[in-house]
Amino acid sequence: LMTMGQDPALANIQALPNIELRLFNPWKQRNLGARAGEMIAEMERLNSRMHDKLIIVDGRATVLGGRNIGDHYFGLNENYNFHDLDVLAIGALAADANGMFDEFWNSEWLASAEQLTTEPDPEKARQGWVRLQLRNRDARELESFPVDPKNWGSEWAMLEPALRPGTGYLVYDDVASGEIGQGMLGTMFAFFEQAQEELLITNAYIIPGEPGMDMLQRLGERGVDIRILTNSLASHDVPAVNSHYEPWRQRIIQTGTHLYEMRADAEIQSIVDVPPVSGKFVGLHTKAAVADGRYVFIGSMNLDPRSAAINTEMGAIIDSPMLAADLRDVMLRDMSGENAWQVTLDDRSHLQWTNADETVTSQPKRGFLQSIMNVVFKVVPREQF
């Protein structure tokens, strides 16, 4: 569904030197008219989406996390940008990443872009690349980025001291089996339930369902200190998710969980936006957790039905007290009153939102239209989000 109408652009990307492109779960019909029938007949299949995010360099290093490739994820959009998180790994995790990539690349879910009916035009692709380079030279939003090749020696010098020792492994949905979206939820719950003292979760889209509530209840009864940060309606880019998250707020808090929601005007916007860009608000896109100050999860998986049963997802589980300490500091900063609302219950068990400046008794929002959309999307089955 995400590549509707993009055949010419995809064909021209494929035509560029040294680039090979494959599409996950593509349309079988290339004609727009025929796709209407395909959508009716195969909507369940077409709704399956590859949500994994992975970069591998020379088979030796990998970057993975929640970040897509787009302006919103790199602080370059004038409307809003995302606070997101990745991890750079060298060693065994990079080897795992190579294996995962090969499984996807060779799976029956992928098709080569060469199968597109639009014929690639190498000259048109080259001209488009030249135009893009010329546009980028003058693009206001790219002022902070070098146009010409740069020596990155100083950046590499800062990188090495920031690396943390640890052991880890990759977890991901098994596309080789022909089934997707069936394994990661159990993996995530097992990670959470290993916590004995403290569990910090930052996740952009949360719809816990009864299984998630049961897990939080069990952890709470064991005395685990649980803190969860997710989006507020005001910081949300997908109000439909908020529509199906909000009925769970009270029950989440009643398990003893400390619940926080991102402020749309969070102070961390200053490190999210890349000057001179200044978005109108900041949203949360991170998917991460720290258990007992030692174990770390960073990946692509949201805690909602779509990630649990429809998307393919992935992540890294890492045993590293030093990395966990770094990430814990970041997560607690993001949960502070300057960056988030703490959602609590008052004496009458009514919800209230408190930040560093004020307490309010209705969920923060950016405007009346958000409130309308929040109501409208309640009629859409939560399993789609």
Feature map (PLM): residue ranges:
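Charged, low-complexity intrinsically disordered terminal segments
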Residues: 1-53, 57-385
